[in-house]
């Protein structure tokens, strides 16, 4: 007899790691997972690390676009599959740094108009509107600012209308990646989310929406 399908979790976390981190959810992502598990209590949680390169090749716009597109496609497929196969499961979407860009773009209602026509065939289509009903919360940790994105030649992230009220953006005050500073290397503050209380804040935001 075939093995029975795995039980659907109460909560499905789809999380994209930050730039240059090894496969998995990354260090900040793991701190967020731990905070979420601590607050969920008896609820079951499954963690899906988004499968994408998380490339640090910011100077190569084509390569950077490819890594983000790979992440958007993989994360979107997991969210849609969960909605189809486990309709009662609450999906939580999130990411850190470059991973937050991936997660943010997954919510987009339309492909950014800044995308050159020759690249459109490679861009994943936005998720169907009804998928938003299955997504309880979106937590974006240290998402690069609009200024940062423009400076590297990428379109800024626009959260889809169906996700705006369920999205939390976390940015430490001195984090130059997300606070609107000109593009440059990350400041010390970019790596303190695991200890500055913000992952707990993100977990609490999720709990309010389950």
PLM features: residue spans?
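Active-site catalytic motif of lipid deacylating hydrolases and related acyltransferases
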Residues: 5-90, 170-199, 203
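Serine-dependent carboxylesterase/thioesterase catalytic core
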Residues: 73-161
